[in-house]
Amino acid sequence: MTANTLTKQIIKFVQLNGGQAERVNNIARKIGNRFVKSNMTKGTADIHCTIKGRSVKIEVKIGRDRQSDAQKLYQQSIESAGGIYYIAKDFDSFYEWYNLNFK
């Protein structure tokens, strides 16, 4: 499974279960012959959600992909502010985590 496919599955699942979810693209854009950095927060999660009134950020990691230092700092800032941060590696483990925390 690709990260793109897993991201779409998670967003659809959250929406079908009454939550709000959106994909956040934090990549540089090509303008003319040069790339311009995004103005998003460095390390932001791939999916931002509100589930049962809670702020949830989900980072999608497939295979050997790991969090960058910026993503680890972002996770710390979300959790210290009372938000929920989850690293999704596959849909089955996400589904289990979701049911443990929101059902």
Residue ranges with predicted function:
Residues 1-103:
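Catalytic phosphate/metal-binding cores of nucleic-acid and nucleotide-processing enzymes, i.e., regions
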